[in-house]
Amino acid sequence: KGELYLELHRATLTSQQEMKRGCRREENLLRTTEYLCAAASVFNPEYRYPREELDGIWKTLLLNQFHDILPGSAIAWVHRQARADYVRDIARLRDIAAEAGASIASARDDADMRSNAAIVPYTAKNGDSWIARTAAVGTQDDDANGTDAVADESTIATTCDDGRIILDNGLLRAIIAPDGTVRSLIDLDNGHELVPDGSGIGHYELLRDEPYEWDAWDIQRDAFLSAEGIDDSHVERVTETKRGGATVHVSSTTDGVSIDACITLRPKSKSLEFRTKVDWRASERFLKVDIPMAIQADRAQYECQYGMVERPIQKNTRSDEAKYESCTHRF
């Protein structure tokens, strides 16, 4: 019962993140699309389930899950081809899902078809969910990630004399240092500080990718002992999103690596969002970002395909110490 953890080939859990991301997004979208297509087949007699097309997309996805594509240990042109497959098939699945949704709406007079909505995880103190708040939420803003709900309030961005930037939306307060790291993140509902003393969220580190054997397959524990921080990092500017949010733009550079990060706090949101673009021209290196959290817990859960695995946070045994790398799909 549980995970069979092999103390080998740990790099395949995180190598080529774009392969993991594309695979998980397409898996999730396939499930949603098949559900909508099945529902359309039930509600609209004229709708024809696109079985052959979905089967073809499934076969391509399963091919890209094969060794060495999904593990990230293939050569470059293989990943380019897989990336193109993900982009093409995800776009097509969205079209199929939209067609199925429109078919359901046309067959049911009571169907309320919305094209400008998004699911916002939210539960009020009285137990009301996002469904009860749909009318109040209104349209969505897609300027950053498509899930910014309309709100009367705005995020207040304040630049201090010492270069620090404070983002405050009444629910969260983030203090961002001139180097772009988040030095404080406070939940204003309970006053809890989420960043440990003396640390910061969003500090990038380069590690040596020189395993004893099998490049792109393994990561040695020694690599973490030689981590080099990217110290040439600074805040470039602060901008406002379309719906009253605030974004801090951070630039980080070192030999062969350029990182552009956007840190966004939106109105009525309890999430501080990071969106990062990396121009990678380095070799025999890999990149990590440090996200320390002041949370008391013994274990952490990480999503994998169709489930999750747990990892010990405290390294009390040799077995715990060996689990220093983990698959992390969406959380």
What are the residue ranges of the model-derived segments?
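Structured mid-domain segments that build the active-site/substrate or prosthetic-cofactor binding neighborhood
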Residues: 1-48, 264, 273-277
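Catalytic and substrate-binding regions of extracellular carbohydrate-active enzymes
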Residues: 10, 16, 27, 51-55, ...
